[in-house]
Amino acid sequence: MLRLVPLGLSWPLSLRRPNILRPDAAPPLFDQSALNYESLEDCCDPSSSSCSAMSLYSFNSERDTATFVHNANGRKFNKLNPLYKLPSDQPEFSRHDKQHELLKSALGGHLYPAPELVESVLSNIPNRRKAILDLGSGSGAWCIEMANKFEHADVVGVDLVANASRPTPSNCRFEFDDINLGLSHYYNQFDLVHSRAVVNGIDDFTRYVEDIVGCLRPEGVAILVEGDWRPYREDKITPYPLAGLGGNEGSWWGRICFEAFELMKKRGSSIDGGDEVEKGLHHPLLRDNQTASYFVPLGPWAIGDTEDYTADLKKQGQLMAENAKEFTGALSHLFEDAGLQSEVVSSWLDNVNAGMFNET
């Protein structure tokens, strides 16, 4: 039986539920003239909730790595946001790259849904630079590709830990920030705001949407992409039961994600924000709201109507399986923090890995 993961357009596993939003107006521009930090001490303690200008701090890898990152279980994790318990290191960035390629494939090779709308909003206008904001930029792949595609636009990627390992175009930059601290310093500055797979690190999804709206210029576009962890049958309606809860049939992928997301919610994450994205977001300053869900196979065995479509499905299934396997492995730190026995977690991971490429 084919297992499918719904993508609406996101979360670490898929492309789920994009919402494309356009404001009729936007709040006034925030005055940044007094903010020019040259050292972290001049800004504030990054662990303090009073620090709202972390994006304006220039990071020096030799000086500041210990301030932003700590080591645990052989992986690196961010220090800014206690809700986000996934790693922030090169293996995780590699997983992000696979997820990025998966989402592009599901979108027919595009970097975004509704390409005609997005490209119209980002069209080159003399004497006016376009601006793109990516919230939760991960490995930076999306930002860099957007900067190369739209050379007349400035691209800003924001994340808890930026990936500094790849060449960056001159019209692209990355900034450290905990977006839960607010984005008022970005208000009214961007033609496109892109957010993908961030809800597990967001503490107040409603406020987050308000900030996204604030960052948009009039007639700008927002794209939110979140994923659904629940695996579905081929009818794309019936979810698989969770393994280990009675009966002989069930999904260990679904089970371990269920356990992880319940822990995230108890810690204060707005995991259910993904469901809000799927339903469609509504705000008094937004119009032309659109939403869609995409499904990708959880394994490389799906068959399409044509050879080309079959090749696309197999590529998506392979990337999804690798992404899912690496994602579940990255959850160990979250489970350990919650006090789960390592033997139980290891058993879950073994079951996920054993079944990921098993068509039955």
Predicted feature descriptions by range:
Residues 194:
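A conserved beta-strand element that flanks and buttresses the S-adenosyl-L-methionine
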Residues 2-189, 207, 227-248, 252-255, ...:
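N-terminal charged/capping segments associated with class I S-adenosyl-L-methionine
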Residues 200-202:
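A short His-aromatic
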Residues 275, 286-299:
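Conserved S-adenosyl-L-methionine
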Residues 206-223:
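A short glycine-rich, Lys/Arg-flanked "PGG" loop and its adjoining helix->strand segment in the class I
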Residues 269-284:
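Short alpha-helix
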Residues 197:
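Oxyanion-hole/transition-state-stabilizing segment in secreted/luminal serine hydrolases
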